[in-house]
Amino acid sequence: MNRIRIHVLPTNRGRITPVPRSQEPLSCAFTHRPCSQPRLEGQEFCIKHILEDKDAPFKQCSYISTKNGKRCPNAAPKPEKKDGVSFCAEHVRRNALALHAQMKKTNPGPMGETLLCQLSSYAKTELGSQTPESSRSEASRILDEDSWSDGEQEPITVDQTWRGDPDSEADSIDSDQEDPLKHAGVYTAEEVALIMREKLIRLQSLYIDQFKRLQHLLKEKKRRYLHNRKVEHEALGSSLLTGPEGLLAKERENLKRLKCLRRYRQRYGVEALLHRQLKERRMLATDGAAQQAHTTRSSQRCLAFVDDVRCSNQSLPMTRHCLTHICQDTNQVLFKCCQGSEEVPCNKPVPVSLSEDPCCPLHFQLPPQMYKPEQVLSVPDDLEAGPMDLYLSAAELQPTESLPLEFSDDLDVVGDGMQCPPSPLLFDPSLTLEDHLVKEIAEDPVDILGQMQMAGDGCRSQGSRNSEKGSAPLSQSGLATANGKPEPTSIS
């Protein structure tokens, strides 16, 4: 028996039919760098790199630029002839636009005869007596009578049209006042010289403007160079730029030459002064800068005149006079003239801020003495009646004994060779009286001793009674006792 095999094909029921994907065009096979442009049909490169394939039906565009003389690098299809000219798509488009513009220019506009023929159909005919042929002949006759020449006119192109000055209409108002021989073409010698002078002045101003422009460009490039050098200096460090250890031998030599060239271009001494004067004269000669320089110079000089000669001193800030002639300015309030003396007047200006009545240093009045010494007090009467035995003799006043340290500030030390001034803390003006009393006692010791001998025993009783009264002035006097011996107190 023959066996029948039945193959059951799987069904697509319940399955999603996949959408066929459109085949993406392959990218260019340029090897030097990845190119994402699609390939040309049947080729391995895009239109930009198709010249890499020597077998491709393309060659370089035949267009050559008139500015720099370079040939277009784009690809163009090979012509049928071997030496034929072929252009790329861009230059084909440009040639088509240029040809279209040229055809527009060469194609003349509608002629006058054609326009009249087109308008003749709108003309009114009298009772239909005129025919189109008669109207055509009438239009031709009018054109023939009004034509400029008997011959046939050629179409007028753009190059044949009159090119006038666009500002001629604006200048037509003043045309009556102008010279009627302005366009005659014949000039006198004076007119030629005047015209040439105006042209030279104009040319000079143009050259000056160009020079200023070049100066501006130089300053701008120098500023950029200094800025870049500063950034590089901050990034790399000073040792790599100026230090000899961070430079090569050739770089050191170049740096040395640059420094020598910089010193060579500098001017010194008289040459520098002459160069500055030359720059000032050039500034005065230029238009615009002359007025500014003149204004700056005149504002810096004093306006006063001495013997019909202007003062050459520099004026003070915000004023027009120098320090010597500032009082001539009636509006200023900062200076006054010195009053001087009755014999010799003085007009030297002095600032008001120093005093209400300012004076120059020659006539300045010194202020009164602020320090006044104190007056010596008179000797009171109750001290004269004191006991005589309380005073010291001349022998006792001799400095035979060493004084304590509290009196050392008031004495002269012979051994040290220097003098110590009295201490201001020990100064007491009330002790001047006691100082005079001690001096009087030291100068006249004999009288004191005589009075003591003449006094009897009876006087001693009286002196003992008065001793209690004299205790008070004794405490104020310049005498003190220490260890039973009288010692003088500190006297300043």
UniProtKB/Swiss-Prot annotation:
Biased composition (Basic and acidic residues): 135-144
Stated name of the protein: KAT8 regulatory NSL complex subunit 2
Annotated region described as Disordered, given as residue ranges: 127-182, 455-492
PANTHER family membership: KAT8 REGULATORY NSL COMPLEX SUBUNIT 2
Phosphothreonine modification, residue list: 131
Record organism: Pongo abelii
Any one Gene Ontology cellular component term annotated for this protein: NSL complex
Record GO biological process: chromatin organization
Keywords, alphabetical: Chromatin regulator, Isopeptide bond, Mitochondrion, Nucleus, Phosphoprotein, Ubl conjugation
Region (Required for interaction with other NSL complex members): 308-364
UniProt-listed InterPro entries: NSL2, Potential_DNA-bd
Placement of covalent cross-link Glycyl lysine isopeptide (Lys-Gly) (interchain with G-Cter in SUMO2): 78
Subcellular location field: Nucleus; Mitochondrion
Residue numbers carrying Phosphoserine: 147, 149, 168, 172, 175
Biased composition (Acidic residues): 167-178
Assembly with partners or alone: Component of the NSL complex at least composed of KAT8/MOF, KANSL1, KANSL2, KANSL3, MCRS1, PHF20, OGT1/OGT, WDR5 and HCFC1.
